[in-house]
UniProtKB/Swiss-Prot annotation:
InterPro entries associated with the record: 14-3-3, 14-3-3_CS, 14-3-3_dom_sf, 14-3-3_domain
Main localisation: cytoplasm
Function as written in the Swiss-Prot or TrEMBL entry: Adapter protein implicated in the regulation of a large spectrum of both general and specialized signaling pathways. Binds to a large number of partners, usually by recognition of a phosphoserine or phosphothreonine motif. Binding generally results in the modulation of the activity of the binding partner.
Subunit and interaction comment: Homodimer.
UniProt keyword annotations, A-Z: Cytoplasm
Source species taxonomy: Eukaryota, Metazoa, Ecdysozoa, Arthropoda, Hexapoda
SMART domains with a match to the protein in the record: 14_3_3
Domain of life: Eukaryota
Protein name from the UniProt record: 14-3-3 protein zeta
Family classification: Belongs to the 14-3-3 family.
Amino acid sequence: MSVDKEELVQRAKLAEQAERYDDMAAAMKEVTETGVELSNEERNLLSVAYKNVVGARRSSWRVISSIEQKTEGSERKQQMAKEYRVKVEKELREICYDVLGLLDKHLIPKASNPESKVFYLKMKGDYYRYLAEVATGETRHSVVEDSQKAYQDAFEISKAKMQPTHPIRLGLALNFSVFYYEILNSPDKACQLAKQAFDDAIAELDTLNEDSYKDSTLIMQLLRDNLTLWTSDTQGDGDEPAEGGDN
């Protein structure tokens, strides 16, 4: 007997409260596969679930990669670290392709308004970006292209159809600028994009929606933090730029 949609959503909310994000993602994947367009709440649950599931692997990957580089003197330790990194990479890739499959098969084709379309295209850009973080050679070239195309498509729709203060438009600008900085190594383009988004939002602060005021101002702060980080000459090695979450 199939579980109904409301029950799956409730299960996802329970899992979120228990911080069991793998369960949360599994429930929201099932909801998505019913083929019905997601509500805003469901869309956010899906995004939060996978953001946490993939985030844990991204964080692990960074730690293991760092250890691998520091154990150059000991071949055995380095080999262990390498094998463990490869295991985490495999998990990370599987999660990303899971999400990208849901986006291409269900979410993007069913998106009936610009807000949803931008949200899902941004998500597509994000998950190809996560693949790019661990990819090398020809594979990296391919996922970088896919990420840039998804972000660019989302960016054009957001500029044409959404207020500069809309949290989804701001979150997209934040993550697209991180893509330029971290993946394409283009700090000038990253700063230009982030600054433009920040300035455009400041110029139209009166259009800030009361419901999304907190989200919008938080992302504006993150844009400004990244600009400060990227333009300072004393940038430390360990500084990670801020990314937008689940707007």
